[in-house]
Amino acid sequence: MKQQIQLRRREVDETADLPAELPPLLRRLYASRGVRSAQELERSVKGMLPWQQLSGVEKAVEILYNAFREGTRIIVVGDFDADGATSTALSVLAMRSLGCSNIDYLVPNRFEDGYGLSPEVVDQAHARGAQLIVTVDNGISSHAGVEHARSLGIPVIVTDHHLPGDTLPAAEAIINPNLRDCNFPSKSLAGVGVAFYLMLALRTFLRDQGWFDERNIAIPNLAELLDLVALGTVADVVPLDANNRILTWQGMSRIRAGKCRPGIKALLEVANRDAQKLAASDLGFALGPRLNAAGRLDDMSVGVALLLCDNIGEARVLANELDALNQTRKEIEQGMQIEALTLCEKLERSRDTLPGGLAMYHPEWHQGVVGILASRIKERFHRPVIAFAPAGDGTLKGSGRSIQGLHMRDALERLDTLYPGMMLKFGGHAMAAGLSLEEDKFKLFQQRFGELVTEWLDPSLLQGEVVSDGPLSPAEMTMEVAQLLRDAGPWGQMFPEPLFDGHFRLLQQRLVGERHLKVMVEPVGGGPLLDGIAFNVDTALWPDNGVREVQLAYKLDINEFRGNRSLQIIIDNIWPI
């Protein structure tokens, strides 16, 4: 199946009230991304939403305060992705700095324990002497685990950002901006953001109770942990709304200034990234995957240990271990992609077209990599995808990724209502979800999922498209504008990096590496000569020496090599004219 990609230009909100002193290009870019006022461009900590609007915080901090006073053993239970790892490390570091000495953490193993606070994970925490469990980036659907903890006399504080179901676990306190009765304006906090807000509230409560004065403890500067917040927020691909942009920008600023955890510094080194020139995309595409590799292939306790360690030498050893795991992950993923594309071809041949929603399974797929695989196939065919791998007990674990127009968790909830028992469990967000089912139910699920997507999704949404910010004038194709755009972020999910389009003469073209197209182009109407590169092109189509003019969708970029800086364009899409 050849996915046709259409170009659409982003609409600009002409009613946005943005500062007149902003360059016209930035005003256009911000207005087309839903920014309506200067307040939404605030990047200082003063602009952060107050923690007081998070429901459940007051009860949670009282429980934690009493635990601190009584020396209660606290176990932080995290998750096996980058958000879970940063949430766990942040919570442990923050509570230690606040004066808690009896604290430990536990991260479930993806392959042995599965996701969340299960009864088995509670037993592990109990074996470690847990007297209070605090979940981070999980717990909102852990009814059985919370009940089991209560039966053992262990209270639970749930901090999470995943969407809640119709009923909530019977925890002593629940903090989640997506609770129905929570008035926190941002529903897009990552798990690490929720954990950070709880620690801010706890610090205030402890200060008001005289905790620090009684013990002659300096009140900690929790802003020192914003590097972890930035990494977890970007890596979890939550929308970068105004509040998340503040958290991310502040964390990135600390990393750029060299004021970050040794583990983050070591990850930057193995990823060959310059901290001083850090972009949000480096967190998402360089650091995040290496941290995630621990949870995907091995055990995320390695990742948490990296983020907790204070010694750069130890951090470098752990970062190299994660880098090697990430390389293995890439190799596994490459093989799985080939198999997935073969499955798509067979499916298309059997019915002349691909279904609106793809559910895929291969008995040799790796359950730690199916989420990435679903993302890759979704990007290729522009439709919701759920990829499954065997869980080893007659069940399958699936990871889904969606497109705009289909809320993945809502779709799974509807399937669960229509076909009770088809799935064992599920959870997630609008754009990503996880589920498990018995292996003999896969064919039924594949059929029902495809039917539901066809029913719910407008067929036009299955047409892949590139959304552009329109053309740049030749005068805007400069290093100064490229730097302006770099500094105008952070860019990310739901606040995309500026992408422009234009008509160019194709002056030179050649392959570099195996699949990257290096070009030199010139605007058809006149303008500067531009070096450009398009990654992972279809080598059956490019290079094509018969093509003289092209339409490009591209990003302005600064190429830095051996101390030299030059303007280049990163080409997302290229169409011959």
Swiss-Prot record:
Molecular functions (GO terms): nucleic acid binding; single-stranded DNA 5'-3' DNA exonuclease activity
GO biological process: DNA recombination; DNA repair; response to X-ray
UniProt-listed InterPro entries: DDH_dom, DHH_sf, DHHA1_dom, RecJ, RecJ_OB, SSDNA_exonuclease_RecJ
Lineage: superkingdom: Bacteria
Pfam families reported in the protein's UniProt record: DHH, DHHA1, RecJ_OB
Keywords: Exonuclease, Hydrolase, Nuclease
Protein EC: 3.1.-.-
UniProt cross-references to PANTHER family, sorted A to Z: SINGLE-STRANDED-DNA-SPECIFIC EXONUCLEASE RECJ (PTHR30255:SF2)
Function according to Swiss-Prot or TrEMBL: Single-stranded-DNA-specific exonuclease. Required for many types of recombinational events, although the stringency of the requirement for RecJ appears to vary with the type of recombinational event monitored and the other recombination gene products which are available.
NCBIfam families for the chain: PRK11070.1 (NF008290), recJ (TIGR00644)
Protein family: Belongs to the RecJ family.
Protein name, per record: Single-stranded-DNA-specific exonuclease RecJ
Gene: recJ
